[in-house]
Amino acid sequence: MSDYLKDSEERMKKTLNVLKSELAAIRAGRANPALLDRITVNYYGTPTPLNRLATITAPEPRVLVVQPWDVSQIGEIEKAIQKSDLGINPVSDGKVLRLVLPELTEERRKELVKLVHKKAEEARIAVRQIRRDANDLVKKMEKDGEISEDERKRREEEIQKLTDKYIKEIDKMVEAKEKEIMEI
């Protein structure tokens, strides 16, 4: 596999991984510890990801339990969760925080599906931009006399196949997430 193709595939994989983590953070009907991945806590003056300060579990379908390793930080963790855009109020018993996730309304589910589609479109645009960069490189190689016109066309077809593969992956991820959100 050529360098330009390896580089393009690597960049497309990164785009897919970013989308995967963004989709994991979008809450569907059931509790998922990944919902709290983006929350940072002021830990002795340093912004620290919540998952580095506590164990996060989902003992029930609509409940998350946050168990801090340093119990003295429970107040800071509680504040960070309240400040987040999740719209969840944690309940503290002094040792652990319980987060009860409300049922999703039909309207909220539709909003989440729109958000999923927006994130997917951003990923598709990124993949197409990577394709454009690779095609520009191949055209430059032809212009500089490094490759023939036939070779350029063959390489552009390879790039297009790679692009199609990753666009299909994005579509599969979106379909699965949409199904998960709309499931009651």
UniProtKB/Swiss-Prot annotation:
The cellular component terms of Gene Ontology attached to this UniProt record, alphabetical and capped at eight, are:
cytoplasm
GO biological process annotations for this chain's record?
translational termination
Listed Gene3D superfamilies: 3.30.1360.40, Ribosome-recycling factor
Keyword Protein biosynthesis belongs to the record: yes
**What InterPro entries does the record point to?**
Ribosome_recyc_fac, Ribosome_recyc_fac_dom, RRF_sf
Q: Which UniProt keywords apply?
A: Cytoplasm, Protein biosynthesis
Listed NCBIfam families: frr
Q: What is this protein called?
A: Ribosome-recycling factor
Biological source species: Caldanaerobacter subterraneus subsp. tengcongensis (strain DSM 15242 / JCM 11007 / NBRC 100824 / MB4)
